[in-house]
């Protein structure tokens, strides 16, 4: 008689697919792991802390290698739990030190996302995805061309950090190569709220990756109600994909603006800052596209918007601007603004006393630059076909070996 596999319930209440009845411990933050150890295993909560450090500090996924656990506890863990990390389909370094991973997600490996590590002077930033694809249809973003497939689980989000940290040899309390995480990869993080917040909790936990709240940044296209909810549940840094300072232009670039126009978005950002003394600024991302949003009048509109935001929060430099040169991708109608236009745009903002940075383009030789992440191909069908070919190639190589 065939064994009936009962789906398990994830921490956010969603049902795990029936391929496994074991609890993936990567799906749990400290609180969830403590509860699992107490309620399911009948073990002391401190045991959860030991396992959490094995997973996130030492990158150990085999319970038998967790040598400070007794044999009986390891047996219970084998019976009720597992640690499933994303499968690395391939990883690709850039000439400038940027590194991109293509990670297969789920038991069948049919979905995949891209994760990018960007080193810089004194810091190393990991750009993490929250969804397979994206449904917001921002016209200048490569990810939008493939449509939306599904949300990532907590395990699949924090698993990206696990893969990168293991590759980098990143160990808390020693020299760090991974110092910052930005939720700026594929997908809209606030549309996968519970899983993203839980994963960010592990990133900031000393038993996890020990990052300060200000070193974890969530970037959103502007889901106003979820920004308000985030204000009550997390103290991470907030970044907003703005890209235009007037509603008419922004609606053509970011369709979500039709539902949450700029005035409502800026009010929610002000509420976010006022919600905690730990928050002192919001970063507004502005992708510069030739002849679209890079003219002097656009810069003056943005400067006025930033001054209004500072006044609303009653704090100087509450709004910071990050100018991003557009990164082209196949099929786009947009072009990158010239260096002269970029510097002229920045000068108008600086002259208006708006704190403004120009993001250095990194990883564009491996399609890892901002706006280029899309699972390597233009749509889901072709993307999944590529995964199958890649995985079949891996199987052939393994068989030959």
Curated annotation (Swiss-Prot):
The keyword Iron-sulfur applies. CDD domains: Radical_SAM (cd01335). Transmembrane segments: none annotated. It is found in: Cytoplasm. Its cofactor is [4Fe-4S] cluster. It comes from the Bacteria. Pfam families: Radical_SAM (PF04055), RlmN_N (PF21016). It is an enzyme of class 2 (transferase). One of its GO terms (biological process) is rRNA base methylation. It catalyses: adenosine(2503) in 23S rRNA + 2 reduced [2Fe-2S]-[ferredoxin] + 2 S-adenosyl-L-methionine = 2-methyladenosine(2503) in 23S rRNA + 5'-deoxyadenosine + L-methionine + 2 oxidized [2Fe-2S]-[ferredoxin] + S-adenosyl-L-homocysteine; adenosine(37) in tRNA + 2 reduced [2Fe-2S]-[ferredoxin] + 2 S-adenosyl-L-methionine = 2-methyladenosine(37) in tRNA + 5'-deoxyadenosine + L-methionine + 2 oxidized [2Fe-2S]-[ferredoxin] + S-adenosyl-L-homocysteine. Keywords: 4Fe-4S, Cytoplasm, Disulfide bond, Iron, Iron-sulfur, Metal-binding, Methyltransferase, rRNA processing, S-adenosyl-L-methionine, Transferase, tRNA processing. InterPro entries: Aldolase_TIM, Methyltransferase_A, RlmN_N, RNA_MTrfase_RlmN, rRNA_lsu_MTrfase_RlmN/Cfr, rSAM. PANTHER family: 23S RRNA METHYLTRANSFERASE (PTHR30544), RADICAL SAM CORE DOMAIN-CONTAINING PROTEIN (PTHR30544:SF5). Reaction proceeds by a ping-pong mechanism involving intermediate methylation of a conserved cysteine residue. Specifically methylates position 2 of adenine 2503 in 23S rRNA and position 2 of adenine 37 in tRNAs. m2A2503 modification seems to play a crucial role in the proofreading step occurring at the peptidyl transferase center and thus would serve to optimize ribosomal fidelity. HAMAP family: RNA_methyltr_RlmN. This is Dual-specificity RNA methyltransferase RlmN. It comes from Xanthomonas euvesicatoria pv. vesicatoria (strain 85-10) (Xanthomonas campestris pv. vesicatoria).
């Amino acid at each position: 008689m065939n064994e009936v596999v009962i789906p398990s319930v994830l921490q956010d209440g969603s049902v795990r697919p029936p391929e496994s009845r074991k609890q993936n411990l990567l799906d749990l933050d400290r609180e969830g792991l403590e509860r699992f150890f107490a309620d399911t295993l009948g073990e002391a909560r401190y045991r959860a802390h030991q396992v959490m450090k094995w997973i996130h500090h030492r990158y150990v996924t085999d319970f038998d290698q967790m040598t400070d656990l007794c044999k009986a506890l390891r047996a219970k863990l084998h019976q009720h739990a597992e640690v499933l990390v994303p499968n690395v389909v391939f990883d690709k370094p850039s000439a400038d030190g940027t590194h991109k991973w293509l990670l297969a997600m789920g038991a069948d490996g049919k979905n995949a996302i891209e994760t990018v590590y960007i080193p810089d002077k004194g810091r190393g930033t990991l750009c993490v995805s929250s969804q397979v694809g994206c449904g917001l249809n921002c016209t200048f973003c490569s990810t939008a061309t493939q449509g939306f497939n599904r949300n990532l689980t907590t395990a699949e989000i924090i698993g990206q950090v696990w893969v990168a940290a293991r590759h980098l040899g990143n160990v808390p309390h020693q020299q760090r190569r991974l110092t910052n995480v930005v939720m700026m990869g594929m997908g809209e993080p606030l549309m996968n709220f519970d899983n993203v917040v839980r994963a960010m909790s592990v990133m900031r936990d000393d038993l996890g990756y020990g990052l300060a709240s200000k070193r974890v940044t969530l970037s959103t296209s502007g889901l106003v109600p979820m920004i308000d909810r985030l204000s009550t549940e997390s103290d991470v840094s907030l970044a907003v994909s703005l890209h235009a300072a007037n509603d008419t232009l922004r609606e053509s670039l970011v369709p979500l603006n039709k539902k949450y126009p700029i005035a409502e978005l800026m009010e929610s950002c002000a509420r976010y800052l006022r919600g905690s003394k730990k928050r002192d600024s919001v970063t507004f991302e502005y992708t510069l596209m030739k002849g679209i949003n890079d003219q002097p009048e656009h810069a003056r509109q943005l400067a006025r918007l930033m001054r209004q935001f500072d006044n609303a929060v009653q704090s100087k430099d509450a709004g910071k601007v990050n100018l991003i040169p557009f990164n082209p991708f196949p099929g786009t109608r947009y072009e990158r603004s010239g260096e002269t236009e970029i510097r002229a745009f920045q000068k108008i903002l600086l002259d208006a006393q708006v704190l403004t940075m120009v993001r250095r383009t990194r990883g564009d030789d491996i399609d890892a630059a901002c706006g280029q992440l899309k699972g390597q191909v233009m749509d889901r069908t072709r993307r999944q076909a590529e995964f199958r070919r890649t995985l079949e190639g891996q199987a052939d190589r393994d068989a030959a070996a």
